[in-house]
């Protein structure tokens, strides 16, 4: 019985401690609202996880940088692992082997939640589960988020999808809509 209880707890608990700092250009743009909204829904998922006996932690912050070039450079060099930038800021750049797309956000502009390819796929998968488990709440956090859906958040664009997003997509589409 104890083993069964522990296995059930793992379904609801964070699979690991998560710490993310999401880089954005300005507090005045939608990128900042998206970053704060991601932190909010992940925190909600953590609260649910704790109510089922989970003991892991979440640290979610935003960091400002005025230049998209600097943000991309810091992600490429793995100084920071996450950023939200406008998709149009990536169009005229050479393809980069180290940038990966986590989610696309079709808000007032199209935005991309990116990371470095070296980020643990299980962390990315947990982030995706946290966002998708609370997609309804996420949609109501800002008027430009209302059209978000499962089908328009995970889209292969110019930047390749992160391995964690691919794993998440496979599990989500097969009906494994677990809590993290």
Spans of features found by a protein language model:
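An extracytoplasmic/periplasmic, membrane-proximal ligand-sensing/linker region
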Residues: 132-180
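A bilobed periplasmic-binding-protein/Venus flytrap-type ligand-binding module shared by bacterial periplasmic
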Residues: 21-24, 106-123
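Short helix-initiation/N-cap motifs at beta->coil->alpha
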Residues: 49-73, 77
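Short, polar/charged alpha-helical segment
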Residues: 31-54
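Beta->alpha turn/N-cap motifs
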Residues: 66-68, 78-90
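Short amphipathic alpha-helical coupling segments at ligand-binding clamshell hinges
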Residues: 34, 119-130
């Amino acid at each position: 019985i104890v083993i069964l209880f522990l296995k059930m707890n793992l379904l609801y608990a964070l699979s690991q401690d998560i710490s993310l700092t999401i880089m954005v250009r300005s507090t005045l743009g939608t990128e900042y609202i998206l970053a704060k909204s991601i932190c909010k829904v992940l925190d909600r998922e953590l609260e649910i996880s704790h109510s089922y006996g989970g003991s892991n932690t979440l640290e979610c912050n935003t960091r400002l940088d005025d230049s998209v070039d600097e943000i991309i450079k810091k992600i490429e060099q793995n100084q920071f692992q996450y950023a939200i930038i406008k998709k149009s800021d990536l169009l005229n750049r050479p393809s980069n082997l180290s940038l990966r797309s986590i989610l696309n956000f079709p808000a007032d502009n199209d935005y991309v939640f990116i990371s470095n390819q070296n980020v643990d796929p299980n962390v990315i998968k947990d982030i995706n589960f946290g966002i998708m488990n609370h997609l309804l709440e996420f949609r109501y956090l800002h008027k430009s988020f209302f059209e978000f859906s499962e089908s328009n958040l995970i889209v292969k664009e110019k930047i390749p999808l992160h391995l964690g997003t691919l794993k998440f997509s496979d599990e989500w589409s097969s009906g494994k809509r677990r809590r993290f």
